[in-house]
Amino acid sequence: MTVANQEDDTPKRHKLKFRSLPGPYSIVRLAAEAPVPDWATKGNFASITRTADELSIVCPAGNLPDAVHSPHRWICLKLEGPFPFTQTGVLLSFIEPLSNGGVPIFAISTYDTDYVLIQEEYARDAVSALQQVGHELLARRES
């Protein structure tokens, strides 16, 4: 393979627009057989995923009852979609600079777009890393 062909194999990097959702958020893991609690479904953004191994819940931190512990508080960044299913490299383009900067993430995909949660202590570094590669932070929408 020539150098020119190797460059052709490089995934396309997208310049994306994103916004920070009002937060903070919590991520919790419950037993796989646990019922979905009412508190998990409240708010403008929540994600509930059940597998054979667990029930994962992402929801506003203020929704958690005292008996439920989440070790971190997270910010939630929403990529401005929608993105067609045929478009490749969208999430990679967004999380690669975060990975390069040592920022841990928790990603959620929906039908229209992607959401990336970042621990609050990494928020400033994360936004800076994203902007340095050309991603654009849009004004926050409160609703």
Residue ranges and their predicted role:
Residues 1-97, 101, 125-143:
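Regulatory modules associated with amino-acid/nitrogen control
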Residues 101-116, 122, 143:
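A cross-kingdom feature marking solvent-exposed beta-strand/loop segments within repeated
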Residues 54-59, 113-119:
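A generic structural motif
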